[in-house]
């Protein structure tokens, strides 16, 4: 199983879907925010197509643990100009359906070819 299941203490009998639903529910109170410009954040990927196509097939085994499309549904409700996400160790700056998605990964020390390991400015007024 994934390390997340060994390092986290979930309530006894909690299923994967219930873990997802629990964390999605924490976001509900913020989904009605309406500002001229919103920058949203999540630890997990809101959509798997944010992963670049150059990722070798043998590394795609982790894809089911990277995020959920239900998170993307919440991002769409907020309609941010930028959504910053993590969990993947692969840097990505891409626009999908009008939203700029950014992952500025630091990754593990040996992952120098997929992460820049530097701070970046994502928005200026």
Residue positions per predicted region:
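Active-site-proximal loop/helix segment associated with metal-binding centers of metalloenzymes
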Residues: 1-62
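Binuclear metal-dependent phosphoesterase catalytic core
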Residues: 52, 57-81, 89-125
């Amino acid at each position: 199983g994934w390390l997340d299941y060994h390092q986290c203490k979930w309530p006894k009998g909690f299923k994967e879907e219930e873990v997802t639903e629990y964390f999605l529910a924490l976001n509900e109170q913020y989904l009605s925010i309406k500002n001229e410009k919103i920058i949203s954040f999540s630890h997990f990927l809101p959509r798997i197509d944010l992963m670049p196509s150059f990722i070798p097939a043998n590394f795609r085994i982790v894809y089911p643990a990277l995020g959920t499309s239900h998170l993307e549904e919440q991002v769409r409700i907020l309609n941010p100009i930028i959504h910053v996400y993590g969990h993947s160790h692969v840097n990505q700056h891409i626009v999908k359906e009008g939203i700029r998605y950014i992952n500025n990964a630091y990754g593990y020390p040996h992952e120098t070819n997929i992460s820049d390991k530097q701070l970046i400015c994502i928005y200026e007024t």
